[in-house]
Amino acid sequence: MLTSLNVIPFDNKNKFIKIFNSIRGDRVKSAVVRGGGIAVNQLTYYSRSGKIKPGKLLRALGGEKIILADERAVLPEGITRFCSNNFSERLCVNMALGVLRKIKNPLDLKLGIFDPEAHSPDLLFEALKLCRNPVAVTFDLLPYDRIRRMALSELGASAVITRRTSELLNCDFVVAPTKICAYIPIKKNAVLLTAGKPYVRLFGEIYHSYAVTLPEIFEKLKPDGLSAEYFGSALYTLCGFYQLGSLVPLSCYGETGGQTVKSLAEKI
């Protein structure tokens, strides 16, 4: 069973409601929703102050240690917010391939892949079906070199595999399937697609989160206050619904706004 938490501050604008809430105190409501072979215990914490009282929440959790919650939630000691980038990495790759398929002249595109730990070497093989001479920057060369040799044999296509991040400076479109933890050189007018907001400041137009439509049965289970990307991540990682990894996002978002697959393809 998955457990989610949504914290809702009391409405204290009305004086009489404020007095009533102060007497009643914080409360926790539980609703178990089932479907698709799983159950979600949706906890709603109604708070006078907007903060969580540890004792009250811990009693409601009944020993559960990992919960789904908004990243801004301040949780009691011993309770961990679920966090995984595995699903977002798949969304990033799927979005990138969707964009490449929509670009009018993909053979003229200078594509870069930044995947330091070689989480998504399959991206290179699929990209080589669509564009010419992409650059893959990785610190784990073997998986990418294996893909490069397979692509050369099956597609007659070649790619540059390197550890040098400076190679990304020549790229118009950079795909980084994992969250970026250290500075990488990207030109100012390049588009960067990644999974999760980078930990460092970078140049380029950066998109790091995704809007996705889950299958209807899972949409009905999604707790209020959680994005489909985050809830999908829990279904993918904790419940083993790996088929969700084939979903193509409707759009991607960054600090400058959002783009659909089509609009991003037209922009690059």
Where are these regions (language model features)?
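Rossmann-like adenosine-cofactor binding region
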Residues: 157-220
